[in-house]
Amino acid sequence: VKGYPTFLLVNAKGEPIDRWLGYSNPEGWTTTFTTAMADPTTIKEKEARFAATPTAKDAALLARIKSASRDYQGALTHYEKARTLDPQGPDYAYSIFDQKSELYLGEKGGMTLAAVEQSAKAAAESKSTTLEEQIWLAEAMEVVAHKAGDPKIMVPYVSAAVKATEGPAGEPYKDARKNILVANALYVAGNKEKALELKRQSMSEGWMESAGKLNAFAWWCFENNVNLPEAEELARKGVALAKPGKEKAQVLDTVAEICNARGDCKDAVELTEQAIKEDPKNDYYAKQLARFQKNVAEKR
């Protein structure tokens, strides 16, 4: 299981028949489940069937299954095959963007930024892209923009999602809209104070007593260079509330990043050393420690 929630449908022998991710609503889940039950062949049998007689339907089905298994390159290949096999059928524009953005954001960087931007534009212009997918597109492009270090990349998608979720049409997506409004205030309007206000409003009830949610808020502040003194204070509270191990290490890392951003490099080193003790098998913290130690040495 690599995503939550992950659904794996198997036969009586325990052989995988289908796999999918996510639970947006009961109707969508039921549609996927019904589709899966209508073809009880195993995934291996589906692959053999496609190899023998390629169809757009099977290409798209295997693409979804591969995407749910985090085989984004395989999924991308099959979505493109589906489009080639049936040029008059669905364009799979959003699904293709989804795979390309995942490849770009992955540790191995298996996709160029230019390719992601091109597929995002195609998805935004496609008539088949749903309102929900338009929201996901804006959210994904915000993450892509952060990695690329260029906030302008997300602006047209965030603006479009804000407009699309106005009024009754956006009511089912009101929680997602709150987050989009934060990005809109920060990157489209350039108003950090308004963005911070909206970010607080977007946090769920009880967030001040949750290590994970305190960490998420503090990390948002760090990423956007907003409200750093309070962010550090809240992240330290998160450390106190966090469970020992990986969770505590993650929050310690957030405090370390904020301290480093505020110029307290020595404290960042000590915090990262604590994170390593909490999660010694995670190589990421060793890299963080080396970075912070280098900062300390350069300031001497």
Predicted features, each with a name:
Residues 40-58, 128, 167-175, 205-209, ...:
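TPR-adjacent "capping" and linker segments in tetratricopeptide-repeat scaffold/adaptor proteins
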Residues 98, 102-105, 138-152, 175-192, ...:
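Alpha-helical adaptor scaffolds
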Residues 31-79:
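Charged, amphipathic alpha-helical linkers/stalks
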Residues 43-47, 73-85, 109-127, 150-166, ...:
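Alpha-helical repeat scaffolds
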Residues 249, 254, 261-300:
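Terminal, low-structured helical/coil segments at or just beyond the last alpha-helical repeat
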Residues 35, 68, 188, 223-224, ...:
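Register position in tetratricopeptide repeats
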Residues 54-55, 89-96, 130-137, 173-175, ...:
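Residues that mark the junctions of alpha-helical repeat units in TPR/alpha-solenoid scaffolds
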Residues 2-42:
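Non-catalytic, surface beta->alpha helical segment in thiol-disulfide oxidoreductase systems
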